Amino acid sequence: MVERKVKVAIPCGIHIRPAGIISHTANGFKADSRIIFGYHVINTASILNLVASGIHCGDIVSVECEGPDEQAALEGITSVLEDSTIQQ
């Protein structure tokens, strides 16, 4: 398992568009991945769970990935979370 703390740079936080991008990215890997925000564990494959998470720009989250391509999954998901160009 690999883990990284990330500061979310998506300007409007995780709403439907970035949630879809995160989910699509996560589903492109065999590794299981999740985002830890406070006491919440969010499955990155679930758009609804991501939207409901209440994660805003500037929040610090942990991304955890476990599986055969865990490092690539971690890089992919964190790059989306750190992308400040994703708009509404």
Predicted regions and their residues:
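Intrinsic-disorder/low-complexity, polar/charged segments enriched in Ser/Thr/Lys/Arg/Asp/Glu/Gln
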Residues: 1-5, 60-62
